[in-house]
Amino acid sequence: MKVTGYYVIVAALLALALRAGPSLAADDRNQDCGPATSDPRANLNGADKAHSAEHTQDFNCQDTPAEEGECYECVLPPEVRIEGAEVIDVADRNFYPRKTLLLARMIRHH
């Protein structure tokens, strides 16, 4: 009976995985080039794009130290303060846009 239950659970998990589609890990990142090539700002209207460009010359914030915080003003909600964020490792910057990773870490810690 236990063996049958095991197969039922495995089959259900497999069915859920197949219905969910591609893995979250299978994104459009090029492992050799660094951050994802897709630009989340593509869906912004003109005013939002201008506001975002005002705070960051480089969308991925590769050249701006995390301590300065200018890169994150358009991403973080007003109630979140930059002082509470973790410093991001250089290794992380090779694969992820810095501000996206920072936002994910802040949500996890607060």
Curated annotation (Swiss-Prot):
Biased composition (Basic and acidic residues): 48-57
Signal sequence coordinates: 1-25
Domain of life according to the entry: Bacteria
Subcellular location field: Periplasm
Keywords, sorted A to Z: Nodulation, Periplasm, Plasmid, Signal
Chief place of localization: periplasm
UniProt GO cellular component terms: periplasmic space
Region of interest: Disordered: 27-64
KW Lipoprotein (keyword) present: no
Protein name: Nodulation protein NolE
Gene: nolE
